[in-house]
Amino acid sequence: MPIFKAKRLCPEAIIIRPKMSLYKRISNIVFSKFNQLTPLVETIALDEAYLDFSGTYQLYKKAPAELLVELALEIEKQLGITISIGLSENKFLAKLASSFEKPRGFTVIGKSEKLEFIKNLHVKNIPGIGPSLKKKLEKNSIMTIDDLRKLDKNVLAKSFGIFGKTIWNMSRGIDERNINPASSRKSISKETTFEHDISCLLYTSPSP
């Protein structure tokens, strides 16, 4: 929620300025722990990443779930913060799993249960389905991932091109994207949200 809306709803609210340098320092510590476990870390944001644990059992003699539990406990003990973890066979399912039971959540989506897990979720949970495509799908009575899964692959390809194949796969719990450390990005952003959309922004810097 934008700050101006929060102030309108709660005029007596005390707004605390963010401590960006602290957030970045803590993030660096957490990500260094990720990289100690596996070199395959794809950073999405200061507080989000994908980790690939393929082959790590030979090194640690521990299953990924055990390593992640130990990691979460170590981070909470050392830094006083909790992390939410999603463990599954691909990015889509792992990201989905991480959104459940926050904070301090740890959700696993196994191969045999993935279709049952995702079937009743709204199609908006599939990466790449934004407001516009969501509206088009809903217009055609496609509300859930299970609704999408029942469609013919060629129909989706005809309607949405190559992305049609992608969402057809994801409706079956299939995600062909690899963990790509080279594409990692980590940033802190500062935004100004206006009450109405504008087409030209002339000045954005605050006064000194």
Language-model features, listed with the residues they occupy:
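Catalytic palm subdomain of template-directed nucleic-acid polymerases
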Residues: 51-68
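Long, highly charged, low-complexity intrinsically disordered interaction regions
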Residues: 64, 68-121
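Generic non-transmembrane alpha-helical segments
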Residues: 29, 33-37, 70-78, 136, ...
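Short, conserved phosphate-binding/catalytic loop or strand-edge motifs used
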Residues: 46-54, 89-91
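Residues that scaffold, gate, or flank divalent-cation-dependent active/transport sites
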Residues: 1-46, 50
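DNA-contacting surface of Y-family translesion DNA polymerases
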Residues: 125, 133-205
